[in-house]
Amino acid sequence: GKVTVDTSTYNLLKSCTELSRLTDGAFDITLGNISDMWGFGTENPPMPDSDELKKSAGKHSYRNIEFDDENTSVCFTDGGFSLDLGAAAKGYAMDMLDSYLRKSGVTSAVVDFGGSILTIGKDNGNSRRISITADETNTLVGTLTVDEGYIATSNGANRYVEHNGKKYIHIIDPSTAYPADSGIKSCTVYSASGLISDALSTAFFVMGEEKTAEFYEKYNIAEYIITRNDGTVSVSDGISADFKAS
């Protein structure tokens, strides 16, 4: 049935669904049940059943969310999925905070929101240098010089489960229902929107370098820094002059 939600929730869900469409489902907010199967954030979860995972893979369930702008209501046209806004809520919150701070007269600020960084204005007239890291040891990949915008990083460093000594990271590839394995260790995205940076850092991590480059050519809505599994780095054209590898 239909659920009427408040405007900000409605806008968040609608924007997320649009980003799911643009990324062909590499970013997908309808993976809640898959994340639950893996048990991220719980103590010693059992290994999920491979048949159950297969059944859940590649569903593109975001297509089953219908929006009614007039009543700000949302309708799920099919069951079998639950929402997980983990890859987007932080970025959206940063967007709200950004507009609140600007309305309050703030002209220069840096807010670090655990992996997502919002920058407003310059630092005494100078651009800011932001450290980009890639893993749980906070290995420095390099520094990015920015004026203002959002920087979000996705990697499997801090959220994972272990089975038989193997780490399974929390970033799920919706096409397989297994953790993403695209040759990328970490992906940082810089754009004018917190939601876009947050969602695309996850999407690019899932898509891998080649598809990310294609997406960049096609839409050009965000810049990226990809750290490959071997530690080498790929930087999008728009920020290559502003990035200094360490």
What are these regions (language model features)?
Residues 1-246:
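Mature catalytic core of soluble alpha/beta enzymes
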